Amino acid sequence: MSKLQSEAVREAITTITGKSEAKKRNFVETIELQIGLKNYDPQKDKRFSGSVKLPHIPRPKMKICMLGDAQHVEEAEKMGLENMDVESLKKLNKNKKLVKKLAKKYHAFLASESVIKQIPRLLGPGLNKAGKFPTLVSHQESLESKVNETKATVKFQLKKVLCMGVAVGNLSMEEKQIFQNVQMSVNFLVSLLKKNWQNVRCLYLKSTMGPPQRIF
């Protein structure tokens, strides 16, 4: 049973889109779901981590890099998808600073089967620590659909603090699409929590430049 009131969510979305229309920016603002938790001890309780694919892509401009074998690198080139081959990864020489920089540069990584197995050896634990270990892409799958699936996936990961934020939409989307994404994100998040809604202290929606709107 979701405790999220549809009305409250719709109202918040309308307020956010209204405020942004009044003050046009020269970029498309992202809408973030901000989460505050309670009755949760990150030291003792299990730190959860989970991903859910949303019905609509929240960040179309999300930066993805393909760590590919020759075939995937060629496909990525044709699509205009940024990519690196094994030789380029070897050049990073497991240098922590360089791996960290790479992890920061992209929102997510995809990797061919032959490459993913070598990642720990080539790069060390850096991508994993950043919560950006690559998603496997086989040659049987379409690279383009895998990219879109990755763009539509959001990840909830509890670290040491009891608050987090995930992108659930952007201001070029229709209100109903934002609503569907918010609903799915919240319900998925609650399913990860030990005591479900009893662990939720507050939920806010916020556009990049706008004030937060409370929805729970």
Curated annotation (Swiss-Prot):
Annotated GO MF terms: RNA binding; structural constituent of ribosome
Keywords annotated in UniProt: Ribonucleoprotein, Ribosomal protein
Keyword Repeat: no
Signal peptide: none
GO cellular component, one term: cytosolic large ribosomal subunit
Pfam families: Ribosomal_L1
Biological processes annotated in GO: translation
SUPFAM superfamilies: Ribosomal protein L1
Family: Belongs to the universal ribosomal protein uL1 family.
Quaternary structure annotation from Swiss-Prot or TrEMBL: Interacts with the GTPase NUG2.
Name of the molecule in the record: Large ribosomal subunit protein uL1z
Originating organism: Arabidopsis thaliana (Mouse-ear cress)
